[in-house]
Amino acid sequence: MKKITFLLVFISIFGYAQTPITDANIQTAVNDWVSDPSAATTTYGAISTWDVSNVTDMSDLFRDKTDFNDDISNWDVSSITNMFRMFHSASSFNQDIGSWNVSSVTNLSKMFVYASAFNQDIGDWDVSSVNNMYRMFDRASSFNQDIGAWDVSSVTDMSIMFFRAISFNQDLSSWCVTNIDSEPSEFSLNSPLSESNKPVWGTC
């Protein structure tokens, strides 16, 4: 009993027992981190080290967190299925998340809307499970990375995907888009994406 009591006191003093991150508390944890990183570190640890492997939903996680730009490159997002609006209006965020395993994600809609600083290489993402890319890069004004190798064969909605993405002009002509017969509404309206770089709709 004395050993257990000592261990609990030791953990309390030195901060080694941190609150696990779950679906139930991850939004609170992010909010706490943004408002007071020092206090959040005491509770959850540094955000770069969070174990998010049990989280399945990151929708709206950094939405409107306009000053957030911390390293989350090592997050294990392999269990995530929903990244809806994850970085919506996170206008300062521009960290390397290219090594994320997003193979379980089905919803990337609005993920980078108004994420005006983001321009990282995410070309190796496995998006083969994704069915929704609606407005994914809408007004992501800096983004211009090669995503031409993405497997988008499961996607059924690409409407407004690159609307006013004023820097984007990468080759998407090899995308497998058999689920989308014709160019979606406002797919790349007011962006520099050339006709030759667009997917060949209805083909694979």
Q: Locations of the language-model features?
A:
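Sec-dependent signal peptide recognition
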Residues: 2-9
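Negatively charged
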Residues: 4, 15-204
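Regulatory input/activation interfaces that engage signals or partners
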Residues: 12
